[in-house]
Amino acid sequence: MYSAFNAGVNAFTRSLAVELGRDGVRVNAIAPDLADTLQTPADAMLRGRDPGMVRHWLPLGRFGQPDDYADVVVFLASDLSRFVTGVVVPVDGGTTAASGWYLRTDGRGWTNLPDQP
């Protein structure tokens, strides 16, 4: 269900951008990932794992903060993005770029097993 919803948001964003572009309306979306918030606290996401592992799981080494997402929204709503429409911006600390690969705990390369050195 989650994947279907995401695909729907992506398609809807592109479709609206095409439909409304001629009227000067830009339509974009963000795709947030792991965020340390009151609704999804880091402790709950860690589920008892060592907090130091976060630097291995996420290329930027930390969970997102609300301001990380808000700043992208402000950019998309500003004239700085006046030629940007129909895109979904991943705000994910690099998890999309890593595609499921994690820095090994010994620092010697990458693994697809996040808890293994």
Stretches with model-predicted labels:
Residues A29, G48-L80, V84, V91-G93, ...:
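C-terminal helical subdomain
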Residues R22, L34-L58, A98-P117:
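A glycine/serine/threonine-rich, flexible loop-to-helix segment
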Residues V18-R22, R82:
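Alpha-helical segment proximal to the catalytic Tyr-Lys
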Residues N28, P32-L38, V87, G94:
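Proline-glycine-enriched beta-turn/loop adjacent to the NAD(P) cofactor-binding site
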Residues F5, T13:
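Active-site helix of classical SDR
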Residues M1:
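Rossmann-fold NAD(P)H-dependent dehydrogenase/reductase core
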